[in-house]
């Protein structure tokens, strides 16, 4: 591990998410879906927030608009996302998933649920609640 217990906590949290993502994206790679981690995050967000704008997505993902514009263009080129002009603000585009984009999102959600169950298997309800409380406390420290 590392030189300090605090670093150990952050390291193990990082490694948990790294393994989770690696397992999740094995499915995408092996299933020939041809999307990147960042593209999958966009699909996930737009699926949960149909009609989201690029600005909303930018704030959520903490990425600049230029980077997201490239991601969105790639997803449009792959026919996974549709962008339509916002009738209330012609400078803004509203994003929605295509059927193909929704299909990939559904597969990712199913795989995410399976991996989540795997990750917390063996925890008692009390341990689960304690872990959730502690991780939430760490999360709040970064706000």
Question: Where do the language-model regions lie?
Answer:
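A cross-family signal for key residues in well-ordered alpha-helices
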Residues: 14, 44, 59, 106, ...
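Short, locally clustered residues in the helix-turn-helix/winged-helix DNA-binding domain
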Residues: 17-18, 44-48, 109, 136
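N-terminal helix-turn-helix DNA-binding core of bacterial DNA-binding proteins
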Residues: 22-67, 72
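Charged, amphipathic alpha-helical coiled-coil/dimerization segments
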Residues: 21-26, 73-136
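N-terminal leader segment of winged-helix/HTH proteins
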Residues: 1-31
């Amino acid at each position: 591990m590392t030189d300090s217990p605090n670093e150990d906590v952050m390291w193990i949290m990082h490694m948990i998410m790294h393994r989770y993502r690696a397992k999740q994206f094995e499915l995408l790679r092996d299933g020939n879906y041809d999307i990147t981690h960042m593209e999958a995050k966009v699909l996930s967000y737009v699926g949960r927030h149909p009609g989201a704008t690029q600005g909303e997505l930018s704030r959520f993902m903490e990425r600049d608009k230029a980077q997201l514009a490239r991601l969105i263009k790639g997803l449009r080129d792959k026919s996974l996302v549709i962008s339509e002009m916002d009738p209330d603000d012609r400078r803004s585009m509203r994003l929605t998933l295509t059927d193909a984009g929704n299909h990939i999102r559904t597969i990712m959600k199913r795989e995410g649920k399976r991996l989540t169950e795997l990750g917390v298997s063996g925890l008692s309800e009390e341990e689960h609640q304690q872990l959730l409380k502690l991780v939430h406390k760490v999360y709040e420290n970064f706000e």
